[in-house]
């Protein structure tokens, strides 16, 4: 089967952080999320990177391709998804592991170097959602992981 060819991004001005909206007990990765997205009619996983519970960073959609993760921003952004983000009742919860948060920080530092001037954003900054279930700015600046239900 031929690999799908996606349009390349012409610019990268945002780096969006998402969560998979899964419970802490679910350790899913790019394979499962790709399947979920395909079941919604998408051609591939919408995120460029997935960070598993153990901190493993998995490549999703080609990094230079237009993603499918934030309506209105896909053509100018990279999408990073942390596995987790909801509690047993389905409410937002910053239940990410220390390994995930360390991997996220390292990846974001790399991406900020690669895409000079790109702004770090949470999905809830531009959509009425809780995603990624924590205050990204506070975590980035103060290293404090606090649940947030913006949206």
Curated annotation (Swiss-Prot):
The keyword Transcription does not apply. Zn(2+) binds at residues 18, 123, 131. It is found in: Host cytoplasm. Gene3D superfamilies: Peptidoglycan recognition protein-like. It is an enzyme of class 3 (hydrolase). SUPFAM superfamilies: N-acetylmuramoyl-L-alanine amidase-like (SSF55846). Coiled coil: none annotated. GO terms for biological process: defense response to bacterium; negative regulation of viral transcription; peptidoglycan catabolic process; viral release from host cell by cytolysis. Zn(2+) is required for amidase activity. GO terms for cellular component: host cell cytoplasm. It catalyses: Hydrolyzes the link between N-acetylmuramoyl residues and L-amino acid residues in certain cell-wall glycopeptides. Its cofactor is Zn(2+). Optimum pH is 7. The keyword Zinc applies. The record marks 47 as: Essential for amidase activity and zinc hydrate coordination. Disulfide bonds: none annotated. SMART domains: Ami_2, PGRP. Binding to the viral RNA polymerase inhibits amidase activity. Its EC number is 3.5.1.28. Keywords: Antimicrobial, Bacteriolytic enzyme, Cytolysis, Host cell lysis by virus, Host cytoplasm, Hydrolase, Late protein, Metal-binding, Viral release from host cell, Zinc. GO terms for molecular function: N-acetylmuramoyl-L-alanine amidase activity; zinc ion binding. Belongs to the N-acetylmuramoyl-L-alanine amidase 2 family. PANTHER family: PEPTIDOGLYCAN RECOGNITION PROTEIN, PEPTIDOGLYCAN-RECOGNITION PROTEIN LC-RELATED. Interacts with the viral RNA polymerase. This is Endolysin.
